[in-house]
Amino acid sequence: YLSYAFPHNHELQLNYTRRINRPRGRQLSAFRNVSDSTNISYGNPNLNPEFANSLELNYIKSWEKHVLSTSIYYKYTTDVIQRVQFQSLENPRVMESTFDNVAKSQALGVELVAKNRLWTWLNLTTTVNLFYQQMGEIVYRDVLLKEASDGFSWTTRLMANFIFGKSFTGQITGSYGSPRVIAQGKTNHFYSLDLGLRKSFLNKTLNLSLTVRDVLNSHSWHTTTWGDTFYQDFERYMYGPHFSLNLTYNFGNMKPKKKPQSNREVNDNMMDEGGEYFE
């Protein structure tokens, strides 16, 4: 990580990271889901973790109430974990799906982040990410399932933070993602809206928070996959909105720390969650 600060609130950063993405429980489970006799799914206990190498150049300009960050990045991932689908050898009318380390992928993109403190009671964070992604050829059990593919995608995220008082805050978050290349096809666009309220008591020792996810009941996963002998549309609904009420108490000077995620990590996680669905 290298950083250089110029006069008049200009800053240039160069950052290299290597991230390990380990397979999740459902992706590893060998249990066969046969609730749909024509679509059988199961995990792969022999999955290896993904290794993602990222190189990023950031330019940051700050004003009194505004910050603008522009990033150019390159990401190279090996042993990409994705779902693979194929016709059953026992019955060609039955589709089987599992997970495998299918390929290598590359992404080159630009990310813009704007933070604006408009009033004392409102600040906005806007993120736009545009990238070109290339996925290598998909091979499963020495069989070529799909040739290499590529495509342009973009995502955006708007987060509004409201300050109603010293101990009362609120948040609205909206996200959108365009269609995206996956192992054997593409995902369709997605969008979502989340709300949150937080109230603190006893000098911020006691915190009460209410979260409403997927307010518009729009959070679904729609993928289209194809091969030499099949074409399939798959759509999963979350059946929202989802409500959660949390009460936390902090002892002493303990302050929980949460590593902030970039817009790219947020959307990658969303895609992973949708991709490991079995029902």
Residue ranges and their predicted role:
Residues 1-77, 161, 166-169, 173:
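Structural signature of Gram-negative outer-membrane beta-barrels, strongest in the C-terminal barrel
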Residues 2-4, 47, 57-61, 72, ...:
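Residues on the lipid-exposed face of transmembrane beta-strands in outer-membrane beta-barrel proteins
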Residues 8-10, 64-68, 120-126, 154, ...:
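Outer-envelope beta-barrel architecture signal
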Residues 14-18, 53, 70-76, 126-132, ...:
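Transmembrane beta-barrel strands of outer-membrane/channel proteins
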Residues 25-33, 37-41, 72, 80-89, ...:
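Outer-membrane beta-barrel translocator domains and adjoining extracellular loop/strand segments
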Residues 42-44, 48, 54, 63, ...:
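Outer membrane beta-barrel strand-and-loop segments of large Gram-negative receptors
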Residues 149-279:
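Conserved C-terminal beta-signal and adjacent last beta-strands/turns
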